[in-house]
């Protein structure tokens, strides 16, 4: 078997969930957490993560991007609330599935609103009514929001309304004024209306709970131990560190002696500066590993060593000259140790950590520890 695999620590996800819950309880103990599982739970396996959170953390609900993601969870036995974060894309087919499987939906535009109100649902649906408070992506304007709310409030298709928005700069403390501006817009447009408030993302629990009161908090990256802040941000520290849930690993497929001044890999993007031992690792961009620059660290036999040359589709090369007794079959950690985070790896590429971790392909099997 090829050595590439992603090891998912479900206990770490549980720890991160409980940390978010603990932070919420300090300021807003009545708030609920909506766990975001879109993009296969940020590459961690949506079904397995949902089953774990439902069973061991009593998670109240999950958010996904599409009807396909929602069906995967429901058909695996998940009975918790499942919210379609973008609502529905087509009308008849999706609305019938929403009705059949009791999904909650987001409504963010006039076309969705009309289709929803005209559909003959057998049972009413929970609606998250989206306000565009300054993200300028999805949602009704502040001027029209109250009217849309009133249309839905007593409609036969609606079991309940959650008022929702999304903050554009919550992960960048230097942009705190814009986040406050969005909150004031949201509060003015929706705060006077009954029903709960909802916002994303989870980083709100770090620095905003004294200012922003939410009944539902949508959180994704923090569940998986990813740094919720922009990499360049001067961010406050969490009272306890998050634990990364994924360790990406593979194995050495061969070790080669390469003389000084020899090119490594396609295009000779690296040339040896000494007589070297080069390890070839069974992972590449076909697995979703990013095209990192020379010098990106990996860990082998407990030591950090650099990548050399371009990442190929199925392989990459590392310089193991200074690591004794490296041999075929030795494990290599690409990210996930406390000493090597995906955030550090991302600084050697043109992708951010979320792009990288959700980009792993089906060639990388997920293995779970608990």
From Swiss-Prot:
InterPro entries the record matches: Ala_racemase (IPR000821), Ala_racemase/Decarboxylase_C (IPR009006), Ala_racemase_C (IPR011079), Ala_racemase_N (IPR001608), Ala_racemase_pyridoxalP-BS (IPR020622), PLP-binding_barrel (IPR029066)
Active site (catalytic residues): 38 (proton acceptor), 266 (proton acceptor)
Modified-residue entries (N6-(pyridoxal phosphate)lysine), positions: 38
Molecular-function annotations in GO: alanine racemase activity; pyridoxal phosphate binding
Known catalytic reactions: L-alanine = D-alanine
Keyword Membrane among UniProt keywords: no
UniProt cross-references to NCBIfam families, sorted A to Z: alr (TIGR00492)
Protein name: Putative alanine racemase 2
Biological source species: Schizosaccharomyces pombe (strain 972 / ATCC 24843) (Fission yeast)
Name of the gene: alr2
């Amino acid at each position: 078997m090829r050595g590439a695999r992603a090891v998912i620590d479900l206990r770490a996800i549980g720890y991160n969930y409980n940390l978010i819950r603990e932070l919420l309880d300090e300021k807003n103990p009545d708030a609920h957490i909506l766990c975001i599982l879109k993009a296969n739970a940020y590459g961690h396996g949506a079904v397995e993560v949902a089953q774990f959170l439902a069973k061991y953390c009593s998670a109240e609900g999950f958010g996904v991007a599409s009807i396909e993601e929602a069906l995967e969870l429901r058909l695996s036995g998940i009975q918790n609330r499942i919210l379609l974060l973008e609502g529905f894309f087509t009308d008849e087919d999706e609305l019938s599935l929403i009705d059949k499987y009791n999904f909650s939906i987001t409504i963010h535009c006039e076309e969705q609103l009309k289709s929803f109100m005209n559909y003959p649902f057998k049972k009413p649906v929970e609606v998250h009514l989206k306000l565009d408070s300054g993200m300028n992506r999805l949602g009704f304007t502040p001027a029209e929001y109250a009217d849309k709310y009133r249309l839905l409030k007593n409609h036969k298709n609606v079991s309940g309304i959650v008022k929702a928005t999304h903050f554009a700069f919550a992960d960048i403390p230097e942009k705190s004024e814009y986040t406050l501006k969005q909150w004031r817009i949201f509060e003015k447009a929706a705060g006077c209306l009954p029903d709960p408030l909802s916002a994303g993302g989870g980083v709100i629990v770090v620095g905003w709970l004294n200012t922003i009161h939410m009944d539902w908090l949508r959180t994704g990256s923090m569940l998986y131990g990813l740094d919720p802040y922009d990499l360049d941000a001067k961010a406050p520290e969490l009272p306890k560190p998050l634990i990364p849930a994924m360790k990406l690993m593979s194995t050495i497929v061969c070790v080669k002696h390469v003389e000084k001044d020899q090119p490594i890999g396609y295009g000779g993007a690296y040339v040896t500066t000494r007589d070297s031992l080069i390890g070839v690792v069974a992972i590449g961009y076909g697995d979703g590993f990013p095209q990192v620059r020379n010098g990106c660290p990996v860990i082998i036999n407990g030591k950090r060593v650099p990548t050399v040359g371009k990442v190929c589709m199925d392989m990459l090369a590392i310089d193991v000259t200074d690591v004794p007794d490296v041999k075929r079959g030795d494990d290599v950690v690409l990210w996930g140790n406390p000493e090597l985070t995906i955030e550090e790896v991302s600084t050697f590429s043109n992708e951010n950590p979320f792009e990288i971790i959700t980009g792993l392909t089906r060639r990388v099997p997920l293995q779970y520890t608990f």
